Design a protein with these regions (language model features):
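Single conserved hydrophobic/aromatic residue that forms the stacking wall/gate
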Residues: 1-13
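A glycine-rich, hydrophobic loop/mini-helix early in the fold
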Residues: 44-85
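Mixed-charge, glycine-accented linear interaction segment located at domain edges/termini
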Residues: 149-177, 181
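Long, charge-patterned amphipathic alpha-helical coiled-coil/hairpin "stalk" segments used as oligomerization
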Residues: 78, 82, 87-155, 159
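Short amphipathic beta-strand starts and helix->beta connectors
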Residues: 23-26, 65-76, 121-131
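Protruding loop/beta-arch "assembly-hinge" segments enriched in small, turn-prone residues
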Residues: 178-191
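Catalytic core of tubulin tyrosine ligase-like
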Residues: 29-30, 48, 144
């Protein structure tokens, strides 16, 4: 009887996990913006961070101590109502190409911006670790905060206002325009 209950509980957890993952995938669809040939922004919010923490706890089974560590790591990536927060990833499968590209993109995290109504809002990298090493090679993952003033938020919420995301880096001068679907999803981060 005990084993049967345990199996039922495990099945229930697996079913709930599947449902949550399905929700997260659907929600992330309009929180993703590609930039150039190698990078993507994944805009974070409470729901994406909660799902990430739950997934880490499920996989690693670290208990309360791990929960504290995960909360400490991921809470800063939840937007505070006056910012957008993104994980900026360089996704390059070929290791030789990846090393070459990342070696040419030192400090890209400091040259990344969102442009709203002609005003550039430069990213503020998360303070956890330096993302560019002494040789000038950048990390493939960056955690970025875009801190908005009230007038930027107002303009961002105007669906007729063009919003761009890009970098001023000399080796990666790319710009993408946010679709209205993406803007609609991200507007909720200002509430």
């Amino acid at each position: 009887l005990h084993d049967k209950r345990r199996r039922q509980r495990q099945m229930c957890i697996r079913d709930r996990r599947k449902a949550i993952r399905k929700e997260v995938v659907a929600m992330k669809k309009n929180r993703r913006v590609e930039l150039g040939p190698h990078s993507t922004f994944y805009f974070e919010n409470f729901f994406t961070m909660k799902a990430q923490i739950q997934e880490m706890l499920y996989i690693e089974k670290g208990g309360d101590e791990q929960l504290r560590d995960e909360l400490e790591a991921y809470n800063p990536l939840i937007p505070n109502g006056s910012e957008l927060v993104a994980t900026f990833m360089f996704e390059i499968d070929n290791p030789i190409t990846r090393k070459k590209v990342l070696s040419s993109l030192g400090n890209v995290e400091n040259k990344t911006y969102i442009k709203v109504n002609g005003n550039k809002i430069f990213a503020v990298p998360e303070n956890d670790v330096d993302r560019t090493d002494n040789s000038g090679k950048t990390s493939s993952v960056h955690f970025l905060h875009f801190k908005f003033e009230d007038h930027h938020v107002k303009d961002f919420k105007d669906m007729d206002c063009t919003v761009e995301i890009g970098t001023d880096h000399e080796h990666y001068p790319h710009i993408s325009v946010l679709t209205n679907e993406v803007k609609t999803a991200l507007i909720k981060d200002f509430d």
